[in-house]
Protein backbone atom coordinates (compact mmCIF):
# COMPACT_ATOMS: atom_id res chain seq x y z
CA UNK A 1 0.00 0.00 0.00
CA UNK A 2 1.14 3.50 -0.80
CA UNK A 3 0.43 5.38 2.43
CA UNK A 4 2.49 8.39 1.40
CA UNK A 5 4.15 9.84 -1.68
CA UNK A 6 7.58 8.78 -0.45
CA UNK A 7 6.58 5.13 -0.70
CA UNK A 8 5.60 5.61 -4.35
CA UNK A 9 8.82 7.48 -5.12
CA UNK A 10 10.82 4.70 -3.47
CA UNK A 11 8.98 1.99 -5.45
CA UNK A 12 9.53 3.84 -8.75
CA UNK A 13 13.20 4.46 -7.93
CA UNK A 14 13.77 0.80 -7.04
CA UNK A 15 12.27 -0.35 -10.33
CA UNK A 16 14.30 2.16 -12.33
CA UNK A 17 17.50 1.07 -10.55
CA UNK A 18 16.79 -2.55 -11.59
CA UNK A 19 16.39 -1.53 -15.22
CA UNK A 20 19.43 0.75 -15.10
CA UNK A 21 21.55 -2.19 -13.93
CA UNK A 22 20.52 -3.96 -17.12
CA UNK A 23 20.52 -1.11 -19.64
CA UNK A 24 22.85 1.41 -18.06
CA UNK A 25 22.23 4.90 -16.75
CA UNK A 26 23.15 8.48 -17.51
CA UNK A 27 23.86 10.81 -14.59
CA UNK A 28 22.23 13.71 -16.46
CA UNK A 29 18.90 11.87 -16.17
CA UNK A 30 17.92 13.33 -12.82
CA UNK A 31 14.14 12.81 -12.77
CA UNK A 32 12.05 9.66 -12.92
CA UNK A 33 10.68 10.62 -16.33
CA UNK A 34 14.13 11.27 -17.82
CA UNK A 35 15.41 8.00 -16.37
CA UNK A 36 12.47 6.07 -17.86
CA UNK A 37 13.01 7.78 -21.21
CA UNK A 38 16.71 6.89 -21.14
CA UNK A 39 16.06 3.28 -20.16
CA UNK A 40 13.59 2.81 -23.01
CA UNK A 41 15.99 4.32 -25.53
CA UNK A 42 18.97 2.26 -24.31
CA UNK A 43 16.89 -0.95 -24.25
CA UNK A 44 15.95 -0.29 -27.87
CA UNK A 45 19.52 0.51 -28.90
CA UNK A 46 20.98 -2.53 -27.13
CA UNK A 47 18.38 -5.02 -28.34
CA UNK A 48 17.63 -3.58 -31.76
CA UNK A 49 13.96 -4.14 -31.01
CA UNK A 50 11.17 -1.86 -29.90
CA UNK A 51 10.35 -2.02 -26.20
CA UNK A 52 7.15 -3.45 -24.75
CA UNK A 53 6.32 -1.74 -21.46
CA UNK A 54 3.97 -3.65 -19.13
CA UNK A 55 2.49 -1.78 -16.16
CA UNK A 56 0.53 -4.09 -13.87
CA UNK A 57 -2.02 -2.50 -11.52
CA UNK A 58 -1.09 0.98 -12.71
CA UNK A 59 -3.94 2.42 -10.63
CA UNK A 60 -2.92 0.85 -7.31
CA UNK A 61 -1.25 3.99 -5.88
CA UNK A 62 -4.31 6.07 -6.76
CA UNK A 63 -6.70 3.55 -5.24
CA UNK A 64 -4.61 3.28 -2.07
CA UNK A 65 -4.90 7.05 -1.58
CA UNK A 66 -8.59 7.24 -2.47
CA UNK A 67 -9.65 8.64 0.91
CA UNK A 68 -7.00 11.35 1.04
CA UNK A 69 -7.49 13.99 -1.66
CA UNK A 70 -4.23 15.80 -0.93
CA UNK A 71 -2.18 12.60 -1.10
CA UNK A 72 -4.04 11.47 -4.20
CA UNK A 73 -3.24 14.74 -5.98
CA UNK A 74 0.44 14.36 -5.06
CA UNK A 75 0.50 10.73 -6.24
CA UNK A 76 -1.30 11.65 -9.46
CA UNK A 77 1.37 14.29 -10.13
CA UNK A 78 4.22 11.84 -9.53
CA UNK A 79 2.65 9.26 -11.82
CA UNK A 80 1.81 11.80 -14.53
CA UNK A 81 5.40 13.06 -14.51
CA UNK A 82 6.78 9.51 -14.56
CA UNK A 83 4.71 8.41 -17.56
CA UNK A 84 4.94 11.75 -19.42
CA UNK A 85 7.84 10.79 -21.75
CA UNK A 86 6.04 7.79 -23.22
CA UNK A 87 4.32 9.67 -26.04
CA UNK A 88 7.63 10.98 -27.36
CA UNK A 89 9.14 7.47 -27.22
CA UNK A 90 7.01 6.18 -30.10
CA UNK A 91 9.96 5.11 -32.25
CA UNK A 92 11.36 3.03 -29.37
CA UNK A 93 8.09 1.57 -28.06
CA UNK A 94 6.21 -1.26 -29.70
CA UNK A 95 3.35 -0.90 -27.24
CA UNK A 96 2.39 -0.06 -23.68
CA UNK A 97 0.15 -2.53 -21.84
CA UNK A 98 -1.61 -1.30 -18.69
CA UNK A 99 -3.62 -3.42 -16.30
CA UNK A 100 -5.83 -2.10 -13.55
CA UNK A 101 -9.40 -1.93 -12.39
CA UNK A 102 -9.90 1.75 -13.20
CA UNK A 103 -10.38 3.24 -16.64
CA UNK A 104 -7.20 5.11 -17.47
CA UNK A 105 -9.23 8.08 -18.73
CA UNK A 106 -10.61 8.56 -15.20
CA UNK A 107 -7.19 8.65 -13.54
CA UNK A 108 -5.88 11.82 -15.25
CA UNK A 109 -2.41 10.28 -15.35
CA UNK A 110 -2.05 9.68 -19.07
CA UNK A 111 -3.36 12.98 -20.43
CA UNK A 112 -0.17 13.26 -22.53
CA UNK A 113 -1.01 10.00 -24.28
CA UNK A 114 -3.89 10.50 -26.66
CA UNK A 115 -3.60 7.18 -28.48
CA UNK A 116 -4.39 4.73 -25.66
CA UNK A 117 -7.06 2.14 -26.38
CA UNK A 118 -9.15 0.33 -23.79
CA UNK A 119 -9.16 -3.27 -25.07
CA UNK A 120 -10.71 -4.85 -21.98
CA UNK A 121 -14.10 -5.43 -23.63
CA UNK A 122 -13.03 -6.05 -27.23
CA UNK A 123 -13.72 -9.47 -28.75
CA UNK A 124 -10.23 -9.77 -30.22
CA UNK A 125 -8.68 -9.61 -26.73
CA UNK A 126 -11.37 -11.27 -24.65
CA UNK A 127 -9.32 -14.38 -23.89
CA UNK A 128 -6.04 -12.82 -22.74
CA UNK A 129 -6.95 -12.74 -19.05
CA UNK A 130 -7.98 -16.32 -18.55
CA UNK A 131 -7.87 -19.82 -19.94
CA UNK A 132 -10.00 -20.94 -22.87
CA UNK A 133 -11.57 -24.36 -23.20
CA UNK A 134 -9.09 -25.22 -25.94
CA UNK A 135 -6.12 -24.15 -23.80
CA UNK A 136 -7.44 -26.17 -20.88
CA UNK A 137 -7.85 -29.33 -22.94
CA UNK A 138 -4.57 -29.03 -24.86
CA UNK A 139 -2.10 -27.32 -22.52
CA UNK A 140 -3.40 -28.64 -19.20
CA UNK A 141 -4.50 -32.14 -20.15
CA UNK A 142 -2.10 -33.82 -17.70
CA UNK A 143 -3.33 -31.61 -14.87
CA UNK A 144 -6.91 -32.60 -15.67
CA UNK A 145 -5.95 -36.27 -15.66
CA UNK A 146 -4.24 -35.95 -12.26
CA UNK A 147 -7.26 -34.05 -10.92
CA UNK A 148 -9.61 -36.75 -12.20
CA UNK A 149 -7.54 -39.51 -10.63
CA UNK A 150 -7.32 -37.72 -7.26
CA UNK A 151 -11.10 -37.28 -7.18
CA UNK A 152 -12.12 -40.70 -8.52
CA UNK A 153 -13.45 -39.26 -11.76
CA UNK A 154 -12.96 -39.92 -15.44
CA UNK A 155 -11.19 -37.32 -17.56
CA UNK A 156 -14.52 -36.21 -19.05
CA UNK A 157 -16.16 -35.96 -15.62
CA UNK A 158 -13.28 -33.82 -14.38
CA UNK A 159 -13.68 -31.53 -17.41
CA UNK A 160 -17.38 -31.11 -16.65
CA UNK A 161 -16.66 -30.45 -12.97
CA UNK A 162 -13.98 -27.88 -13.83
CA UNK A 163 -16.33 -26.15 -16.28
CA UNK A 164 -19.11 -25.97 -13.69
CA UNK A 165 -16.78 -24.67 -10.99
CA UNK A 166 -14.39 -22.29 -12.78
CA UNK A 167 -15.78 -21.42 -16.23
CA UNK A 168 -18.17 -18.71 -17.29
CA UNK A 169 -16.22 -15.45 -17.36
CA UNK A 170 -16.92 -13.23 -20.36
CA UNK A 171 -15.01 -10.08 -21.20
CA UNK A 172 -16.94 -9.07 -24.29
CA UNK A 173 -20.30 -9.70 -25.87
CA UNK A 174 -18.99 -12.46 -28.15
CA UNK A 175 -16.35 -13.83 -25.81
CA UNK A 176 -15.88 -17.55 -25.50
CA UNK A 177 -16.14 -18.95 -21.98
CA UNK A 178 -13.04 -18.17 -19.96
CA UNK A 179 -11.78 -20.15 -16.96
CA UNK A 180 -10.54 -18.28 -13.90
CA UNK A 181 -6.78 -19.04 -13.81
CA UNK A 182 -6.34 -18.34 -10.09
CA UNK A 183 -9.01 -20.81 -9.06
CA UNK A 184 -8.13 -23.34 -11.75
CA UNK A 185 -4.45 -23.53 -10.82
CA UNK A 186 -5.27 -23.70 -7.11
CA UNK A 187 -7.63 -26.59 -7.84
CA UNK A 188 -4.90 -28.39 -9.78
CA UNK A 189 -2.31 -27.76 -7.04
CA UNK A 190 -4.59 -28.97 -4.25
CA UNK A 191 -6.35 -31.63 -6.33
CA UNK A 192 -9.75 -30.50 -5.09
CA UNK A 193 -12.69 -28.40 -6.22
CA UNK A 194 -13.23 -25.36 -4.02
CA UNK A 195 -14.10 -21.68 -4.16
CA UNK A 196 -10.50 -20.47 -4.03
CA UNK A 197 -11.40 -16.97 -5.17
CA UNK A 198 -13.45 -16.33 -2.02
CA UNK A 199 -11.16 -17.83 0.62
Question: Which residues does each predicted region cover?
Answer:
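Phosphate-binding site recognition
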Residues: 1-199
